[in-house]
Structure formats: structure tokens, C-alpha cells
């Protein structure tokens, strides 16, 4: 727990408290699961509402979903390639929507109104466990993509154009999930802390610009994560890279 205190008890903000769920020998961060389920439920409601009565002339939620589908399809096609992007479009789209929902949910939903025995609710992506799990999932995905498309020939990538590159390619495989996870975690946590501190110090109007900037940053971070995930998968399946 890292306390942030201010003189004369003007404000106090604590970071690092968690609601733990004990399952066997495992300690799970309960507030992350709760807020994640809220985001997933909201996304399911959005998708069901937009696809329940499909119309040839889309309007409302259907129009929004079709716009997102077209945008993510173009992103996946550009990064992965024409031959393989269809297999990975649902994965890339799910990543983007979940991260976007988590980021915006952390900024817009009044989580502090929900009292917990310990800790407080917030954006799931402001917890390092969430971002590391998604980054490792991306790593497993591009390994699977390369092996399923090329078989053992995939490992030729590690010794091309010369075997001297082998240790550097291995290090790169470790740095990819690290950069993905810490970039997303750091940006979302920093945004929550900045808005939280400003809200404690000057609760009227002043935090609004920081909150709007946080919404923009949150959307960009979701796009960056999805784009890099698609790019890594594209590198694994493209013949010219191996």
C-alpha cells in the first residue's frame, strides 16, 4: 500500500489495497473480476441489442457495431494479411473491445459508489495482472499462428539471416509481452491517479479536462494493443519474414 498524503488532511489517496478471494492456495483480486464481469456484461448487452434485429439500413447500435467491425477488419487485414486475417479477426476484435470497455469503464463508471470490504473497484486494466495475462495470451497466439501455418519451419525465423541473431530474437519474444502489459497498465493507472488526486484537491470542474484527456488516451491504448497484437501475428504467418 502506497499512501499519498497532503498537508492539513486536505486529501488522502491510497493505492494498492485489494479485495482478495481465497480459492485453495490462490489469492485472487476480487475487484478485478467484479469490474471485468461488469464490462463483459455491458459488451454482451451492446452486441445482443445491435444484432437482435438486423436491418439492411443500419441505425443506432447496429450502425455502431458495423462501423467497429469494418474498422477492425481493415486493421486486421492490413497487419496480418489477406490470407490469414479472417481467422484472427474475432480475437483482435475481442481484445480491442474488452480493453476499450475496461479503460472507458474505469473513467466513466462511478465505481466508488460501490463499497467493498477492502479495496475499491476500478478499471481492470489498471491492475498489472490483467494486462500481463492479456499480453501472455497475445504471445501464445502468435506462437500458435506461426506453428500452425509453418510447422517447425517457424523456428527458422530465430536464425535468419544469421544464427548470431538467435539470442536477440529470444530476448525480443520476452520484451513483446512486457512492453504490451506495462504500457497499458502504466497509462491507465496513471490516468486514474491523476484524476483521483485532482478530484480530491479541486473537486469542481478542474478534473474534467484530465478526465477527457484520459478517455482519449484510453481509446488510443486499446487501439495500440490490438494493432500490435495483430502485427505480431502477421509477422508469425507471413512467409517473407521467415
Swiss-Prot record:
A matching Pfam family: ATP-synt_A
Keywords linked to the UniProt accession: ATP synthesis, CF(0), Hydrogen ion transport, Ion transport, Membrane, Organellar chromatophore, Plastid, Thylakoid, Transmembrane, Transmembrane helix, Transport
GO biological process: proton motive force-driven ATP synthesis
Record-level Gene Ontology MF annotations: proton transmembrane transporter activity
Entry similarity comment: Belongs to the ATPase A chain family.
Job description of the protein: Key component of the proton channel; it plays a direct role in the translocation of protons across the membrane.
Coiled-coil stretches: none
Membrane-crossing segments per the record: 28-48, 89-109, 128-148, 193-213, 214-234
Organism in which the protein naturally occurs: Paulinella chromatophora
Topology in the lipid bilayer: Multi-pass membrane protein
Name listed for the protein in its UniProt record: ATP synthase subunit a, organellar chromatophore
Subunit composition and interactions: F-type ATPases have 2 components, CF(1) - the catalytic core - and CF(0) - the membrane proton channel. CF(1) has five subunits: alpha(3), beta(3), gamma(1), delta(1), epsilon(1). CF(0) has four main subunits: a, b, b' and c.
Entries under CDD domains matching the protein: ATP-synt_Fo_a_6
A cellular component annotation (GO) from this entry: proton-transporting ATP synthase complex
Subcellular location: Plastid, Organellar chromatophore thylakoid membrane
Main location: plastid
